[in-house]
From Swiss-Prot:
Gene giving rise to this polypeptide: ureG
Swiss-Prot/TrEMBL GO biological process terms: urea catabolic process
HAMAP family xrefs: UreG
The protein's name in its UniProt record: Urease accessory protein UreG
Keywords, alphabetical: Chaperone, Cytoplasm, GTP-binding, Nickel insertion, Nucleotide-binding
Length: 206
């Protein structure tokens, strides 16, 4: 727990469709909810499917999860015109003023997606092995500039002909000293490392 009250930490989670963003949010919420006061905001273009999935998974009580329909390019709603998400954050913090963390999941987007610094204090970008071992070296702000990069679904590497060693090497070249984690989120592989990063960088831990 935090030793003193600070403004809620806003953690943006981005990445392509199907990379594991909603799974990451579910796992983070279930692992952290006993220690921290959490709320979550999900973005979808025309539905609130990710909100529904988070709710039925029991990640958080339904009133602590808000779905936002962006109605257009999901990148715009987290970067160029983040007003719809900034309003959602304000509404959630009005309901839960003691929240320690606000998770904000972007809609699925391409490698160019980034969060506005107005919206997110920490950015986590999720890619997955099933997209091919070439993904890290394609670059883009999500891969090169995010605070933490997650390479998810490492268990699928043998089935898609991807080399985890090549992906790790390419990621180091693209990110320099910026951290990344190899994960199998469905089995909670790498989850503890992600939580430690959030606690350390977000100044949550005592």
């Amino acid at each position: 727990m935090r030793t003193k009250k600070l403004p809620a930490l806003r953690v943006g989670v981005g990445g392509p469709v199907g990379s594991g963003k909603t799974t990451l949010l579910e796992m983070l919420c279930k692992a952290m909810r006993e220690r921290y006061d959490l709320v979550a905001i999900t973005n979808d273009i025309y539905t609130k499917e990710d909100q529904r999935l988070l709710t039925i998974s029991g990640a958080l009580p339904a009133e602590r999860i808000m779905g936002v329909e962006t109605g257009g390019c999901p990148h715009t709603a987290i970067r160029e015109d983040a007003s719809i998400n900034l309003e959602a954050v304000d509404r959630m913090l009005a309901k839960f003023p003691d929240a320690d963390v606000v998770f904000i999941e972007s809609g699925g987007d391409n490698l160019a997606a980034t969060f506005s610094p107005e919206l997110s204090d920490l950015t986590i970008y999720v890619i997955d092995v099933a997209g091919g071992e070439k993904i890290p070296r394609k670059g883009g702000p999500g891969i090169t500039k995010s605070d933490l990069l997650i390479i998810n679904k490492t268990d699928l590497a043998p089935y898609v002909g991807a080399s985890l060693e090549v992906m790790e090497s390419d990621t180091r070249k693209m990110r320099g000293d910026r951290p990344f984690v190899m994960c199998n989120l469905r089995a909670q592989g790498g989850l503890d490392e992600v939580i430690r990063f959030i606690e350390r960088q977000g100044m949550l831990a005592a």
